[in-house]
From Swiss-Prot:
Family annotation (SMART domains): Cg6151-P
Species of the source: Drosophila mojavensis
Family classification: Belongs to the calcium channel flower family.
Protein name stated in the entry: Calcium channel flower
Subunit structure: Homomultimer. Associates with the dally/ magu complex.
Lineage, uppermost ranks: Eukaryota, Metazoa, Ecdysozoa, Arthropoda, Hexapoda
Membrane topology, record value: Multi-pass membrane protein
Length: 196
């Protein structure tokens, strides 16, 4: 396969529906990819910043958290934009394998990769870099939940009771959840009040 054919195949993937995935609007499909690419770029950049700012600071905090954040950025970049790693053949295979899995797998993977650098070294660089990866996971999680019902379906479901009948709608100020509850007196003390 030629280089241009391979590049066209890699760029056409976001338009295809994932295997077994829910119907997602086009702006969520492309938006999640773009957010993932931007998140990976900033995670790599701020992870490198954490690693290079090791001089005079905590080794375990900056060095380890920065390396984990950079690795998370590279994984997200490899899964969201495998055309950035054209020279590595296995990246495309791994990306196709992850694309075949349900959306909640990718959402959980991204959220799980984003949390350790934030807990290991809480700072703006780790919060922003890993926070964007976590936001990408949250968008994939929303896509995994699927499309909500139409407004008419939600109104019909809200009007029904748990027994399947129609709920008696009331607009009284004294309507309550419990049918035999005594209302508070609006003019004075309740008759059973001990005035203590």
């Amino acid at each position: 396969m030629s280089f241009t054919g391979k590049l066209a195949e890699l760029l056409a993937r976001p338009n295809q529906d994932p295997a077994g995935g829910p119907e997602a609007p086009w702006y969520l499909k492309y938006g999640s990819r773009v957010l993932g690419i931007v998140a990976a770029f900033f995670a790599i950049l701020f992870g490198l910043w954490n690693v290079l700012s090791i001089i005079g600071l905590s080794v375990s905090c900056m060095l380890v958290a920065g390396i984990i954040q950079m690795l998370a950025g590279f994984v997200v970049m490899a899964l969201e934009a495998p055309f950035c790693f054209v020279c590595i053949e296995k990246v495309n295979d791994v990306s196709k394998m992850v694309d075949a899995k349900p959306m909640f797998f990718r959402a959980g993977l991204y959220c799980a990769m984003a949390v350790p650098p934030i807990f290991m070294c809480f700072g703006l660089a780790s919060l922003f870099g890993s926070g964007l990866i976590f936001a990408t996971g949250a968008v994939y999680g929303m896509m995994a939940l699927g499309k909500k019902a139409s407004a008419a379906d939600m109104r019909a479901a809200a009007a029904q009771t748990s027994y399947g009948g129609n709920a008696a709608s009331t607009t009284s100020d004294r309507a309550g959840i419990v049918s035999n509850a005594q209302p508070f007196s609006f003019t004075g003390a309740v008759g059973t009040d001990s005035n203590v």
